[in-house]
Amino acid sequence: MTNWGPTGELVYNRTYSRTKPDGSKETWPETVRRVVDGNLALVDERYHLPGERADLIRLMEEFKILPGGRHLWASGVKNAQHLFNCWVSGWTEKPSDHFEFTFMRLMEGGGVGANYSNRFIDYGPVQQELYVHIVCDPDHPDYEAMKEAGVLSTEYDPDWAGAFVIEDSREGWAAALVDLIDTHYRDEVSHFQRVYDVSRVRQFGAKLKTFGGTASGPLPLARMLIDVCEILSEIATEGGQLTGIAAMEIDHAIAQCVVAGGVRRSARMSMMHWKDPQVYEFLRIKQDTGSHWTTNISLEVDDEFWVAVEEGWAGPNNRILRELTEGMVANGEPGFWNSSLSNVGEPNEVVCTNPCGEITLEPWEPCNLGHVNLAAFAHGNGSYDITGLYRAHRLVTRFLMRATFSPVADPKSREVLDRNRRIGVGHLGVASFLALCGWKYSEARTNEEFKWLLRSLAEEVDHAATQFAHQLRIPVPVKKRTVAPTGTIAKMPGVSEGIHPIFSRYFIRRVRLSMSDPDQTRMLADYGRQGYEVEDDLYAKFTGVVSIPTQDTLVAEVIEHYGQDSESLVESAADLSLNELLGFQALYQTIWADNAVSFTANVDPETYNADDVRQQLRLFGGLLKGATIFPEASMPQAPYERITKEQYEQATAKAVADGVDEDCANGACPIR
């Protein structure tokens, strides 16, 4: 019997349970066996430990270890073992390489980070002003919708011999984008009218077998090609060069195309260096344009930045910090990323993080994540299973190292993956673990036993990685430990997410389900019949929202073990100061994570202003590889809404274990 968290089975069925050949859905034990067997098959059986398969199955079924979402979705799937959640897209001598890589990884269901600092982007003038014409067979089911949207050419038709016929595949879509961008950069072009035939692209709503979800049809692709052409043609008309901001606009157009299906999600991270000539435009790009909603925004800082801030607190560097912190307090962006601190211990330069910020990566490199659920090893009487924790960390390390042998689509990624073998062993359920051990979250920084435990577990990971690398005759992973937000993963066992404190002891949790997916549509109907409030999403098409009054189950667990007066052991985000939140992140960054820590410090904008945040960043800036500070603002259909204990008791409630927002902008990851 699976011991689900209160919304765990819903999240599992929505996100990770695959449809079997007979049309039925996987159960959790079936998913676990698929994932474990797929992972073990990546290396020869002689490299398996005695009983390793049985141990992995048991620990995963009990939610004591959980690999990253891509592993749960794709491991063991024939011809589709795309096991890596996120990537960094770099820049080569050919501008289309970056955009092709971004498009392909997003279409595979991954997230992509990129550094748009202009020092990376030097391609000379855009040579050609072009015009895109979209043509389509009138018998295509989406023809009328495309005609109504105004994207079809009035000058060309599908019979024109010079049309570029777009094949109905990820590679086919990307080939059309590459053709367009490369043509913009050619010295000589015979045809300035670029005609793209979308007749072979499957219709809107068709099922996508490999990655799940439904097809968006040819309309979003047509719009993307038109948008990209307009961006580059405007630059060509002015005799200009591609800039970091313009490249962001192209990637935004690409991401909009990918998410248009209603089920598929994309996640992106955009960075720019603090000394870049476009930095002020970058810092305000979302507010000023109302666009770029497909990406998170983070400012690249370094040691020079923090020195300059201290030496010239009232100077221009403070202006950048002021813009940064005013944005944080207003809407949670930008965050910052410390490239100097992140490059310590790296054999080659890392240029960006994945969209959630827990892994710093070289160009083309993927993140490779797995997690140990600390809460599952707490006995609830002040003790914990230290032997079990060691075993779990050792097995997750080996699991992720085997995953580095999985196929990747791009040879640039293969080269860096083989060279670095980077893994990210992380924790979830940390706040739950602390409370069940009788320790307060706010006191963890001075808790010597907890700090000893983190150091000991880090040593176990490092030892296991070194030992296994020598057996496999591969390089020891350049870095091994991280903290991911685990927003979706943690919901299955119903524990706190990553190292975040719980959101609130009592709250309304809103679950979003896609109306484009038949299974999720049935879930919406079931919730409505049970009396829950169900409404259309105000922010996303084809999406419904279910509101569930909630008591965080950690409260009940702690009271069960420590008595009615122990509720104060469970500290929520609202109980903690910004200093305590950033201090906890710094603890994990300095003791546990050689990669990075993804963490969102939620603050009340009525309590903290930009000056308050600036002072805290001055204290912690040199210790943290990155930070995201998010204002808790009341908004319609917020994923979480605090309520009082009395309000909860008055409601018809289901106990739900939860933490922070699943939305990537709030520090968690929508990529499964």
From Swiss-Prot:
Catalysed transformations (reactions): a 2'-deoxyribonucleoside 5'-triphosphate + [thioredoxin]-disulfide + H2O = a ribonucleoside 5'-triphosphate + [thioredoxin]-dithiol
Cysteine pairs bridged by disulfides in the record: 86-367
InterPro entries (alphabetical): RdRp_reductase_class-2, RNR-II_ins_dom, RNR_alpha_hel, RNR_lg_C, RTP_Rdtase_AdoCbl-dep
Superkingdom of source: Viruses
Gene3D superfamilies tied to this protein: 3.20.70.20, b-12 dependent (class ii) ribonucleotide reductase, Chain A, Domain 2 (3.30.1620.10), b-12 dependent (class ii) ribonucleotide reductase, chain A, domain 3 (3.90.1390.10)
A GO MF term: ribonucleoside-diphosphate reductase activity, thioredoxin disulfide as acceptor
Catalytic residues identified in the record: 356, 358
TM region positions: none
Keyword Acyltransferase appears in the UniProt entry: no
Stored Pfam families: Ribonuc_red_lgC, RNR-II_ins_dom, RNR_Alpha
Protein name: Putative adenosylcobalamin-dependent ribonucleoside-triphosphate reductase
GO BP terms, alphabetized: DNA replication
Organism whose genome encodes this protein: Mycobacterium phage Bxz2
Cofactor(s) in the UniProt record: adenosylcob(III)alamin
Keywords on record: Cobalamin, Cobalt, Disulfide bond, DNA replication, Oxidoreductase, Redox-active center
Protein EC: 1.17.4.2
Keyword Oxidoreductase applies: yes
Family affiliation: Belongs to the class II ribonucleoside-triphosphate reductase family.
